[in-house]
From Swiss-Prot:
Keywords: Cytoplasm, Methyltransferase, rRNA processing, S-adenosyl-L-methionine, Transferase. This is Ribosomal RNA small subunit methyltransferase H. The lineage of its organism: Bacteria, Pseudomonadati, Pseudomonadota, Alphaproteobacteria, Hyphomicrobiales. Specifically methylates the N4 position of cytidine in position 1402 (C1402) of 16S rRNA. Coiled coil: none annotated.
Length: 341
């Protein structure tokens, strides 16, 4: 769970980070775990939320696409005495593991975990020499595949949209020139090039490579698409009165969650660019404020919490209107399948 741009620097720069569940008190207050309830933790990670939910008396189904997290969580499974199922799966596929309308609550903690950042061989950090990988699972296209094979125009879009990198064009063209001489293989290869092309200024709070590495990670793991589809899946498997709680650390992720809850509130009214939306019954009603940020005290103790935002909703009995990814206005980027070669 990396933090937002300047606030992300400590994790994105690769410094050791002890896993502390972000906004744990707020998550539990919104989720309301209790004996007899079944809660799904869609992003198990180091198990911080799962542990607290179990302590509250609820049973837990936990998912993670990272096999390393699944292996590390086995002692917790053993200690839970049958109250915890830990499944190797993307959270967008959660409906494959639970019956429709069968859950009392779902929590998502979006982003990369501190465990992944700390392992140089995973290739998430540019301050640790490792393979240019960034995959949350062992399968699929790596960051090296993207950097070495994508068209310059595609790299510009990836860096510009997913990383909000203002120097996307300059960096992409430098990558094209460098890879013609030798392919990028390590995190240092790429980080050093970016730092040469866009040197760090004294006023800069983050390393010049932060946004590009962020963009590559989001792209390689299709994090925005995964989140959007996970929200739709959550809507199908929550029972009436069930609660969906989502913690995000980046404006792109938060925008998707905000859009989803607005669309499902039955109050979405279109915009100057889109026609008015036909009114329909709400499938979610808000829990408390539309958005809750981490407290100043928590942010001072845990830098990862500085950009955290929590949004939550309660499932109504209304039928799901179905999956329509167009509501999120996601960009058209290069195909991961094509880059796999």
């Amino acid at each position: 769970m990396v933090t937002d741009q300047g606030d992300r620097a400590s994790e994105a720069d690769g410094g050791p980070v002890r896993h502390i569940p972000v906004m744990l008190a707020e998550v539990l207050a919104a989720l309301e775990p209790a004996p007899g309830k079944v809660i799904l933790d869609g992003t198990f990670g180091a198990g911080g939320y799962t542990s607290a939910i179990l302590d509250a008396g609820a049973d837990v189904i936990a998912l993670d696409r990272d096999p390393t997290a699944i292996a590390a969580g086995q002692p917790m499974v053993a200690a839970a005495g049958g109250r915890l199922r830990l499944i190797h799966s993307r959270f967008s596929e959660l409906a494959d593991h639970v019956p429709e309308g069968g859950l009392d609550g779902i929590v998502f903690d979006i982003g990369v975990s501190s465990m992944q950042i700390d392992e140089a061989e995973r290739g998430f950090s540019f301050q640790k020499k490792g393979p240019l990988d960034m995959r949350m699972s062992a399968a699929g296209v790596s960051a090296a595949d993207v950097v070495n094979r994508a068209k310059v125009s595609d790299l510009i879009r990836i860096f510009g949209f997913l990383g909000e990198e203002k120097q996307a064009g300059r960096i992409a063209r430098a990558i094209e020139k460098r890879r013609a001489e030798a392919p990028f293989e390590t995190t240092r290869n790429l980080a050093n090039l970016i730092e040469t092309v866009t040197p760090r200024k004294a006023k800069d709070k983050i390393h010049p490579a932060t946004r590009v590495f962020q963009a590559l990670r989001i792209f390689v793991n299709d994090e925005l698409g995964e989140l959007a589809n996970a929200l739709f899946a959550a809507e199908r498997v929550l029972k009436p009165g069930g609660r969906l709680v989502v913690v995000t650390f980046h404006s792109l992720e938060d925008r998707i969650v905000k859009t989803f809850f607005q669309d499902r509130s039955g109050k979405a009214g279109g915009s100057r660019h889109l026609p008015l939306v036909t009114a329909r019954d709400a499938t979610f009603t808000p829990v408390g404020k539309p958005m809750v940020a981490a407290s100043e005290d928590e942010a001072s103790r845990n830098p990862r919490a500085r950009s955290a935002k929590l949004r939550a909703g309660v499932r109504t009995p209304a039928a799901s209107p179905g999956n329509d990814l167009s509501i999120f206005n996601l960009p058209e980027l290069a195909s991961l399948a094509r880059l796999g070669g």
